[in-house]
Amino acid sequence: MKWITRERPKIDRIACPWLIARFIDKTPEFIFAPARDVRRLAGELKAIPFDIEGVELSHDGPLCSFDALLKKYELTDPALAELAVIVRGADTARLDLAPQAAGLLAISLGLSHNFTDDHEQLRHGFVLYDALYAWCKDVRNETHTWNPQRAGRNHSQA
């Protein structure tokens, strides 16, 4: 299927294609267009619009487009629900929703700054979302506790 959204993706417009490709559509084609052209091109190209005002798969109150996709496609994986909270926090500037939201926001803005090609940015963003999903699903309780001070090392020495 073809999917279309606004160009220059940030948070939701990277998270949604990741969700679509991993759980909804095994062979998606993503199209990025200027916001003013998305609905028109969706009709012309028979593409499903998302994360654009006035379409089904978009923000609804405090929820973001990632939430809309989870609901429409009845995705009930608890790890996806947890990831949705992180995405929602980062995408709606509600960083209090999850401690990871601030990091996701920072990394997403960095990706957008580093890549001018939307599809290249998406490719790199998928790695990020694969890692976040793995954390939510399998390793959320793992910590990193290495402390060289406890091992008798002194950081002031070269």
Language model feature labels by segment:
Residues 1-8, 18-150, 154:
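Extended, well-folded catalytic/binding cores that form a central cleft or groove in large enzyme
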